[in-house]
């Protein structure tokens, strides 16, 4: 394909231009490039004329291969678009080829018969001739005029058939071309081409059956397709018969039968009649008279059954032919000696079965069977009278002397009907042979010896030589017992008495047996005669005795017949079973052998396929490489030829031979070309320089010479111009004068018409003025009407707009009033509910105080008992000083390892019964795999708390002030040294203590340490360390934060009992069945279950569930100040809300608000402890103190449990100790003895009723907020909490905060700490002096409930305020929060 792109129209035009000048090859190349172009793969109307012109050129130039390639390309182009165009193009192509061939045939006298195969024109004779004459084979063939065109036409037919095969869209065209090809072979007697054509059609048919899944495949089940194939095969059969190619005709018959087998419907009777007629001809030509007669029988029966208009003459003609064909069958089948010796009977039978299959017969026919069928179907009655008796003479009558004479008359009549019945003439020789054989058989039964001349006189239609040959053949094949005596010229019959006839000996008219047959059956005949004689001469009593014996035998048989029959059946059954078993074994063995053989064959086949595949790949690679090499050589050759055509290339490559392509490459050619270009360029530049110099000198010399001549010419031109100007000026003046005179004359002549003109104009204006005024008046009227209509429409629209606005305002006012009414109803309902809750809470407090009083008394008794036991134990030990010093419970506690984190040596002295506190040396946190089991245990413990409260639980809740002061073990005693966290003789309080990790919601140790815990008690139950500090302890506070806070929850605390002692209210976190256990920061379990079950799970630092609630979170609001769902961490928890790891507020605070300010923006203390897992967590609120339980993994434990992880952000154990934790107060918390007041969460009915009431009374649901509102709400929460922490006063740092001399040191802040600190500093709002309204303090008159504190959004985010904050800031909002403070210091939120 050329490098340039050419449109199809331009290519056709270009080709026509080439044809006009007689250049057919360039025109063909142009069209070929367009057809092969990949840019023209879509059929266009211009493609058809291009293809016709292309094929015309191919025919003219006899380029059959180019025509084939073009047709294939055109098929791909138009197959899916316009298949009719392909049919037209192919028909036109074949028509052109046929016309050219016919023209060559008319103009040539040379015949094509001397060349047997057009594909193999080169014969041995032509090779010798070319060697002698030195003439090329193709030249000799081209010199012949007709042969090349016949070959071209044959190739055209074959190429078109290959092109159209197995394509249902051009199936009709395919069969038309196939029939044309058969006619071509018949016309030019091309036998070799006919065989090839038959093979091709047979191969195409097999491909149709094999590739039936293609989109354009032919469906052989289609009746139209079957009829077309049968039609083509019948034409093939006719052509084969006409050309006497009987082998090809037989193959065509097999193909037709195969098509019949494919068809589900029977073929048409006309088609079957034609088929039987052709097949009968093939059988007769092949010498198979038996199947020829059988075919005629089938044709006769088909015609009688299917043809309704069958005439009597046709019946006679068909019956006569069937009779003659049947009687023409040889009496005995001919079988040669070699066939008898080789035992070819099986092969012959197989061949006969195949032939019978072609006729639809179940078994091969026989001569006797056909004759019987002919008689049975009464076919003889339709035979012409002249031939009717032939059957009786040959098959029934025994009359040897007149047999040949009678048959001769019939044969003479048949010969006379040669013109009317030509097909009957072929049976005459066979009938004569059968007549001679019948004559010999009958003569052999009559005569023992007969003269040859006498026998010859009985057979008048043959000569002596043929008669002798017939006698010899009869003796060989027909078991005729005859001997020829040439000396006496006689024939002897039956002379050999030892001769035995064959079983298949022919039957015919019979008179008597031959002597040999009589000798062979003599004993049989004698036996029959003797048995008859014995029967005649036997006496009567012998016959009677024989009859009696016969009856006895019959009776015995009848008696034992059934038993014998059963025995025979059983034996037969046994034999059958044994045979079946043997057969099954044989079948199984054969099957196994077959499978083994098949596996081996499969393996060999796979190996062979793999080898062939590899060879094919290698061949394909070699072919591709060769193609690439050829393309490369072709490119180089074309490039060299193009370059050599130029003047530059001719010079550069004059010494290079194009044939030596192996030594050349494109780079070499390009280098030579560039070198020659550079050389010529240099020569051209030098030549141009020389020429430039020469021209420069020449021009300078010319200008020097022409200067004086130019001056002279200038002067002459100036003078001439002056004279010309003067002459023209005079002519102009004279012309102007003449024009002036003519203008004056015209003015005078036209001035007489002025008055008439003015009169005409005035009349015209007067007539038009009235018309103008009328139109103007009409316009003014229409303008007024349109203006009035528009004003009316505008008035109506304004009126409608005012009405709509009025109704809309009215509806809005009604809606506002309805909302206000609803708000008032909700407020009243909430007020009633709050009063009811307060009453229930008071009842609950009273019951709880009674329970605590009982527990305190039990505890005191148990303490006294334990004190007496301890004293007796110390006295029994011998009064050692060390033990006496520690004899008191408090002194011993000072040195116990669980309090001061003693050295390993000291920890070894701890009694083994206290190992449960440390968790033992090998104690490790245990993760609970089944949270449901733990919750069931917890609930069981809570349900039995009143009946099974142990003395140990009571001892931990109560402290005895007097005993503490006497023993010097008071926790508030200032002489004991620094508070918790700074003591040298005690470990830090429970952090990662000796008792193992604190109880968490991920542990499988059962419920948290509660009232009926059956394990070793936690601090204070039966502990020798003394009870924990209670709220009524008069000792110094062990929580070293400040002194002005109320005490932690104790037994006699008037704030109401801790959670977990009463069954009426919802238990605190960790004991509730309905809620999940408290969550840690990085807990990846299910969602945290608190008061509200529809919230998302609580998030932690390393939680992989996505980010926690931040500014960009679109989930519902977190529990905060205004959340009426109750605080998350315990119903009565007065602490601030739990903080998340993305919280931008200040560091988290402890449990009271009266202490120093929280860590704020300007705090210069150490890094905060808590939220970040890679920083040391806070102990309460300061960094310098001993570490509290949790939050950091790289610090030491307070109780020596160095290998036990502490609780914190990454701790999967239980939650931290909350404000309502029943494990005793935490060190560092508020110790103020102010009575404890329950929050609004302590309501009767449980948290579910409160949640339901909240949802009924509150505003829109949490999840119904827009993402922007929820984001603002959370930002408001965080910023408000930060501001509240920053407003707290700074407290003095105590030794407890600095952590004493503990070996644990805060770890270095990680790079992430500074980043998070910077982020929090940037986001933190400015500090204010406003106190936290939801904390209790002594210096305040009132306390607000956790939900009652309004939030304020950060300054940067005030424009994003959500619906919660808007209802506080906007007075018009119906849902506005109204905090009210009662006399007890509690704040109630009214909405």
From Swiss-Prot:
<feature type="compositionally biased region" description="Basic and acidic residues">
    <location>
        <begin position="1313"/>
        <end position="1380"/>
    </location>
</feature>
<feature type="repeat" description="13">
    <location>
        <begin position="1092"/>
        <end position="1101"/>
    </location>
</feature>
<feature type="repeat" description="25">
    <location>
        <begin position="1210"/>
        <end position="1219"/>
    </location>
</feature>
<keyword id="KW-0396">Initiation factor</keyword>
<feature type="repeat" description="3; approximate">
    <location>
        <begin position="993"/>
        <end position="1001"/>
    </location>
</feature>
<feature type="repeat" description="18">
    <location>
        <begin position="1142"/>
        <end position="1151"/>
    </location>
</feature>
<keyword id="KW-0677">Repeat</keyword>
<feature type="repeat" description="21">
    <location>
        <begin position="1172"/>
        <end position="1181"/>
    </location>
</feature>
<dbReference type="GO" id="GO:0003723">
    <property type="term" value="F:RNA binding"/>
</dbReference>
<comment type="similarity">
    <text>Belongs to the eIF-3 subunit A family.</text>
</comment>
<comment type="subunit">
    <text>Component of the eukaryotic translation initiation factor 3 (eIF-3) complex, which is composed of 13 subunits: eif3a, eif3b, eif3c, eif3d, eif3e, eif3f, eif3g, eif3h, eif3i, eif3j, eif3k, eif3l and eif3m.</text>
</comment>
<dbReference type="Pfam" id="PF01399">
    <property type="entry name" value="PCI"/>
</dbReference>
<dbReference type="GO" id="GO:0033290">
    <property type="term" value="C:eukaryotic 48S preinitiation complex"/>
</dbReference>
<feature type="repeat" description="26">
    <location>
        <begin position="1220"/>
        <end position="1229"/>
    </location>
</feature>
<dbReference type="Pfam" id="PF22591">
    <property type="entry name" value="eIF3a_PCI_TPR-like"/>
</dbReference>
<feature type="repeat" description="11">
    <location>
        <begin position="1072"/>
        <end position="1081"/>
    </location>
</feature>
<feature type="compositionally biased region" description="Basic and acidic residues">
    <location>
        <begin position="940"/>
        <end position="959"/>
    </location>
</feature>
<feature type="compositionally biased region" description="Basic and acidic residues">
    <location>
        <begin position="809"/>
        <end position="921"/>
    </location>
</feature>
<dbReference type="InterPro" id="IPR000717">
    <property type="entry name" value="PCI_dom"/>
</dbReference>
<feature type="repeat" description="12">
    <location>
        <begin position="1082"/>
        <end position="1091"/>
    </location>
</feature>
<feature type="repeat" description="15">
    <location>
        <begin position="1112"/>
        <end position="1120"/>
    </location>
</feature>
<feature type="repeat" description="8">
    <location>
        <begin position="1042"/>
        <end position="1051"/>
    </location>
</feature>
<feature type="repeat" description="14">
    <location>
        <begin position="1102"/>
        <end position="1111"/>
    </location>
</feature>
<comment type="function">
    <text>RNA-binding component of the eukaryotic translation initiation factor 3 (eIF-3) complex, which is involved in protein synthesis of a specialized repertoire of mRNAs and, together with other initiation factors, stimulates binding of mRNA and methionyl-tRNAi to the 40S ribosome. The eIF-3 complex specifically targets and initiates translation of a subset of mRNAs involved in cell proliferation.</text>
</comment>
<feature type="repeat" description="5">
    <location>
        <begin position="1012"/>
        <end position="1021"/>
    </location>
</feature>
<keyword id="KW-0963">Cytoplasm</keyword>
<feature type="repeat" description="4">
    <location>
        <begin position="1002"/>
        <end position="1011"/>
    </location>
</feature>
<dbReference type="GO" id="GO:0016282">
    <property type="term" value="C:eukaryotic 43S preinitiation complex"/>
</dbReference>
<feature type="repeat" description="1">
    <location>
        <begin position="973"/>
        <end position="982"/>
    </location>
</feature>
<keyword id="KW-0694">RNA-binding</keyword>
<feature type="compositionally biased region" description="Basic and acidic residues">
    <location>
        <begin position="1265"/>
        <end position="1307"/>
    </location>
</feature>
<feature type="region of interest" description="26 X 10 AA approximate tandem repeats of [DE]-[DE]-[DE]-R-[GATV]-[PS]-[KRW]-R-G-[AEFGIL]">
    <location>
        <begin position="973"/>
        <end position="1229"/>
    </location>
</feature>
<feature type="repeat" description="6">
    <location>
        <begin position="1022"/>
        <end position="1031"/>
    </location>
</feature>
<feature type="compositionally biased region" description="Basic and acidic residues">
    <location>
        <begin position="966"/>
        <end position="1234"/>
    </location>
</feature>
<feature type="compositionally biased region" description="Basic and acidic residues">
    <location>
        <begin position="1246"/>
        <end position="1257"/>
    </location>
</feature>
<feature type="repeat" description="20">
    <location>
        <begin position="1162"/>
        <end position="1171"/>
    </location>
</feature>
<dbReference type="GO" id="GO:0003743">
    <property type="term" value="F:translation initiation factor activity"/>
</dbReference>
<dbReference type="InterPro" id="IPR054711">
    <property type="entry name" value="eIF3a_PCI_TPR-like"/>
</dbReference>
<protein>
    <recommendedName>
        <fullName>Eukaryotic translation initiation factor 3 subunit A</fullName>
    </recommendedName>
</protein>
<feature type="repeat" description="7">
    <location>
        <begin position="1032"/>
        <end position="1041"/>
    </location>
</feature>
<dbReference type="GO" id="GO:0001732">
    <property type="term" value="P:formation of cytoplasmic translation initiation complex"/>
</dbReference>
<feature type="repeat" description="10">
    <location>
        <begin position="1062"/>
        <end position="1071"/>
    </location>
</feature>
């Amino acid at each position: 394909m050329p490098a340039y792109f050419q449109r199809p129209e331009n290519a056709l035009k270009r080709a026509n231009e080439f044809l006009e000048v007689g250049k057919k090859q360039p025109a063909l190349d142009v069209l070929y490039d367009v057809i092969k172009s990949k840019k023209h793969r879509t059929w266009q109307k211009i493609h058809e004329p291009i293809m016709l012109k292309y094929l015309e050129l191919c025919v003219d130039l006899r380029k059959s291969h180019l025509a084939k390639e073009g047709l294939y390309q055109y098929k791909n182009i138009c197959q899916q678009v316009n298949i009719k165009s392909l049919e037209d193009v192919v028909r036109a192509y074949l028509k052109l080829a046929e016309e050219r061939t016919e023209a060559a045939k008319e103009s040539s006298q040379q015949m094509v018969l001397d060349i047997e195969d057009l594909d193999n024109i080169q014969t041995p004779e032509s090779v010798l001739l070319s060697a002698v004459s030195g003439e090329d084979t193709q030249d000799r063939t081209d010199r012949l005029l007709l042969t090349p065109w016949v070959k071209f036409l044959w190739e055209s037919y074959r190429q078109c058939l290959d092109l159209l095969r197995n394509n249902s869209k051009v199936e009709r065209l395919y069969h038309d071309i196939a029939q044309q090809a058969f006619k071509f072979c018949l016309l030019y007697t091309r036998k070799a081409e006919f065989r090839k054509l038959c093979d091709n059609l047979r191969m195409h048919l097999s491909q149709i059956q094999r590739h039936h899944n293609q989109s354009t495949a032919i469906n052989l089940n289609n009746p139209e397709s079957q009829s077309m194939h049968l039609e083509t095969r019948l034409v093939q059969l006719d052509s084969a018969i006409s050309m006497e190619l009987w082998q090809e005709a037989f193959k065509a018959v097999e193909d037709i039968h195969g098509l019949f087998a494919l068809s589900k419907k029977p073929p048409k009777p006309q088609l079957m009649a034609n088929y039987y007629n052709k097949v009968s001809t093939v059988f007769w030509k092949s010498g198979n008279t038996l199947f020829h007669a059988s075919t005629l029988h089938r044709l006769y029966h088909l015609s009688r059954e299917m043809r309704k208009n069958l005439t009597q003459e046709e019946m006679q003609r068909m019956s006569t032919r069937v009779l003659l064909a049947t009687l023409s069958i040889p009496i005995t089948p001919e079988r040669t000696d070699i066939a008898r010796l080789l035992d070819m009977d099986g092969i012959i039978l197989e061949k006969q079965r195949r032939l019978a299959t072609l006729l639809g017969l179940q078994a091969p026919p026989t001569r006797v069977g056909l004759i019987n069928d002919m008689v049975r179907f009464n076919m003889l009655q339709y035979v012409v009278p002249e031939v009717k008796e032939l059957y009786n003479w040959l098959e029934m009558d025994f009359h040897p002397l007149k047999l040949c004479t009678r048959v001769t008359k019939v044969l003479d009549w048949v010969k006379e009907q040669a013109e009317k019945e030509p097909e009957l003439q072929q049976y005459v020789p066979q009938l004569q042979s059968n007549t001679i054989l019948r004559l010999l058989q009958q003569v052999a039964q009559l005569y023992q010896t007969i003269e040859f001349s006498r026998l010859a006189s009985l057979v008048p239609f043959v000569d002596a030589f043929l008669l002798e040959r017939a006698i010899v053949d009869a003796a060989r094949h027909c078991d005729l017992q005859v001997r020829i005596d040439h000396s006496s010229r006689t024939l002897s019959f039956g002379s050999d008495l030892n001769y035995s006839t064959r079983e298949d000996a022919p039957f015919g008219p019979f008179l008597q047996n031959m002597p040999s047959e009589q000798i062979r059956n003599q004993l049989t005949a004698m036996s029959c005669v003797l048995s008859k004689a014995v029967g005649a001469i036997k006496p009567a009593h012998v016959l009677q005795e024989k009859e009696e014996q016969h009856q006895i035998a019959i009776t015995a048989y009848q008696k034992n017949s059934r038993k014998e029959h059963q025995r025979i059946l059983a034996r037969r059954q046994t034999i059958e079973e044994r045979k079946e078993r043997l057969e099954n074994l044989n079948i199984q063995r054969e099957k196994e052998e077959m499978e083994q053989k098949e596996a081996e064959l499969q393996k060999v086949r796979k190996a062979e396929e793999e080898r062939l595949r590899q060879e094919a790949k290698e061949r394909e690679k070699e072919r591709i490489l060769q193609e690439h090499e050829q393309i490369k050589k072709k490119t180089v050759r074309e490039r060299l030829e193009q370059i050599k055509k130029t003047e530059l290339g001719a010079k550069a490559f004059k010494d290079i031979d194009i044939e030596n392509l192996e030594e050349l490459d494109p780079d070499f050619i390009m280098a030579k070309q560039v070198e020659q270009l550079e050389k010529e360029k240099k020569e051209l530049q030098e030549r141009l320089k020389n020429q430039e110099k020469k021209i420069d000198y020449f021009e300078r010399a010319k200008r020097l010479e022409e200067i004086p001549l130019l001056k002279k010419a200038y002067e002459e031109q100036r003078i001439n111009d002056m004279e010309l100007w003067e002459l023209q000026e005079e002519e102009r003046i004279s012309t102007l004068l003449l024009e002036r005179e003519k203008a004056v004359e015209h003015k005078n002549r036209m001035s007489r018409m002025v008055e008439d003109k003015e009169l005409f104009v005035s009349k015209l204006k007067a007539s038009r003025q009235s018309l103008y005024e009328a139109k103007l008046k009409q316009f003014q009227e229409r303008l007024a009407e349109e203006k009035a209509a528009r004003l009316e429409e505008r008035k109506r629209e304004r009126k409608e707009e005012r009405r709509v606005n009025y109704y809309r305002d009215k509806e809005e006012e009604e809606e506002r009033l309805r909302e206000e009414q609803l708000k008032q109803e909700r407020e009243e309902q909430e007020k009633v509910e709050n009063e009811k809750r307060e009453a229930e809470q008071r009842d609950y407090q009273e019951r709880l105080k009674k329970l605590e009083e009982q527990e305190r008394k039990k505890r005191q008794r148990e303490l006294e008992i334990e004190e007496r036991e301890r004293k007796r134990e110390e006295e029994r030990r011998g009064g050692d000083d060390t033990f006496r010093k520690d004899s008191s419970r408090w002194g011993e506690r000072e040195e116990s390892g669980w309090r001061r984190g003693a050295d390993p040596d000291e920890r070894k002295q701890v009694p083994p019964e206290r190992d449960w506190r440390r968790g033992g040396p090998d104690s490790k946190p245990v993760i609970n795999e089944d949270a449901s089991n733990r919750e069931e245990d917890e609930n069981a413990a809570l349900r039995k708390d009143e009946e099974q409260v142990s003395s140990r639980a009571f001892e931990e809740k109560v402290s005895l002030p007097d005993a503490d002061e006497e023993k010097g073990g008071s926790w508030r005693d200032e002489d004991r040294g620094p508070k918790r966290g700074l003591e040298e003789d005690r470990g830090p309080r429970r952090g990662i203590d000796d008792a193992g990790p604190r109880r968490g919601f991920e542990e499988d140790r059962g419920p948290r340490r509660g009232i009926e815990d059956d394990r070793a008690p936690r601090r204070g139950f039966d502990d020798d360390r003394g009870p924990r500090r209670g709220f009524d302890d008069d000792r110094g506070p062990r929580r070293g934060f400040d002194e002005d806070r109320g005490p932690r929850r104790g037994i006699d605390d008037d704030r109401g009992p801790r959670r977990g002692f009463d069954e009426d209210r919802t238990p605190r976190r960790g004991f509730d069945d309905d809620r999940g256990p408290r969550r840690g920061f990085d807990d990846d379990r299910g969602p945290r279950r608190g008061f509200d079950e529809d919230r998302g799970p609580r998030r932690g630092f390393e939680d992989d569930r996505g980010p926690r609630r931040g500014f960009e979170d679109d989930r519902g609001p977190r529990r905060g100040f205004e959340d009426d769902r109750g605080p998350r961490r315990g119903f009565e928890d007065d602490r601030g809300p739990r903080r998340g790891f993305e919280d931008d507020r200040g560091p988290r605070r402890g449990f009271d608000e009266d202490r120093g300010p929280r860590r704020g923006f300007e705090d210069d203390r150490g890094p905060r402890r808590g939220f970040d897992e890679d920083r040391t967590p806070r102990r309460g609120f300061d960094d310098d103190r001993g570490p509290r339980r949790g939050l950091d993994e790289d610090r030491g434990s307070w109780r020596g449990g160095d290998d036990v992880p502490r609780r914190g952000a990454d701790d999967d154990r239980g939650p931290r100790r909350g404000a309502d934790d029943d494990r005793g107060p935490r060190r560092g918390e508020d110790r103020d003895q102010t009575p404890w007041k329950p929050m609004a969460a302590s309501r009767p009915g449980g948290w579910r009723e409160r949640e339901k009431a909240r949802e009924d009374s509150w505003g829109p649901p949490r999840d119904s907020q827009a993402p922007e509102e929820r984001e603002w709400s959370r930002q408001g929460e965080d910023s408000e909490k930060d501001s509240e922490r920053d407003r707290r006063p700074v407290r003095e740092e105590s030794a407890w905060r600095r952590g004493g001399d503990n070996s644990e040191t805060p770890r270095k802040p990680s790079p992430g700490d500074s980043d998070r600190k910077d982020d929090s500093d940037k986001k933190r709002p400015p500090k204010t002096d406003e106190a936290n309204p939801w904390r209790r303090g002594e210096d305040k008159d009132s306390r607000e409930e956790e939900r009652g504190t309004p939030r304020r959004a950060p300054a940067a985010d005030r424009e994003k305020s959500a619906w919660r904050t808007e209802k506080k800031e906007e007075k018009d909002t119906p849902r506005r929060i109204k905090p009210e403070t009662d006399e007890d210091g509690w704040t109630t939120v009214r909405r």
